[in-house]
């Protein structure tokens, strides 16, 4: 995990954004476009969400073809944080193909904290694309959305996601043992987190 030297608490607290923040979209990185979902994405989404290895550590079953339309439709308008528990879900596009998705889910707006998450097509693993997408996700969370802290929860057996959290500079703050009944067995949970001050320091901002 990357070492971060910024103090966790700055004396000057940044101005708080008004509820209803909507980041400018789409977002373009070196190789990716992060954009709202749209009709026509169903086939690409099905290509990864229907895989057992993708949903193994997620609270979801493999996506069925008949449900792909509803899955995409539910995410079409998930582009702003306007109230407690709202979420932003963006398609990750690479060379005109949706290869995954990223998520920001707010808690209480007054706390300025959000959960982040992701899912990617394993066909594209090993090229740094997940890191590229998640890095831009942090820029949205700590930039336009003005979050104070972001966190991710994952099954510790999901080493790919754990390594991604570590590459992002997130630290493991908690490890809960058999705290959830998950897909027929008791499972553990790891919590990773990062503060805005740490994120800015790591970027030299």
What are these regions, as identified by a protein language model?
Residues 1-123, 140, 144, 178-179, ...:
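GNAT-family acyltransferases
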Residues 98-102, 154-165:
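Membrane-interacting alpha-helical segments
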Residues 120, 126-143, 159-167:
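Conserved acetyl-CoA-binding loop-helix of GNAT-fold acetyltransferases
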Residues 144-153:
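Conserved GNAT acetyl-CoA-binding A-motif
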Residues 149, 177-178:
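Short, Lys/Arg-enriched C-terminal cap helix and immediately downstream tail that follows
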Residues 154, 161, 173, 185-188:
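Short histidine
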Residues 166-176:
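Conserved acetyl-CoA-binding loop of GNAT-fold acetyltransferases
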């Amino acid at each position: 995990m990357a070492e971060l030297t910024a103090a966790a608490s700055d004396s000057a607290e940044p101005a708080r954004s008004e509820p209803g923040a909507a980041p400018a979209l789409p977002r373009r990185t070196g190789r990716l476009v992060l954009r709202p979902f749209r009709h026509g994405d169903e086939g690409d989404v099905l290509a990864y969400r229907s895989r057992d290895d993708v949903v193994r550590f997620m609270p979801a079953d493999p996506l069925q073809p008949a449900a792909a339309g509803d899955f995409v439709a539910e995410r079409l308008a998930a582009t702003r944080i306007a109230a407690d528990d709202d979420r932003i879900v963006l398609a990750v596009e690479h060379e005109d193909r949706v290869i995954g998705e990223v998520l920001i889910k707010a808690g209480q707006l007054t706390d300025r904290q959000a959960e982040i998450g992701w899912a990617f097509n394993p066909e594209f693993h090993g090229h740094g694309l997940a890191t590229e997408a998640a890095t831009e996700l942090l820029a949205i969370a700590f930039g336009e959305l003005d979050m104070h802290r972001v966190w991710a929860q994952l099954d510790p057996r999901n080493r790919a996601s754990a390594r991604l959290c570590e590459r992002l500079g997130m630290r493991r703050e908690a490890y809960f043992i058999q705290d959830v009944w998950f897909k027929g067995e008791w499972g553990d949970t790891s919590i990773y987190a990062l503060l805005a001050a740490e994120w800015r320091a790591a970027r030299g901002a």
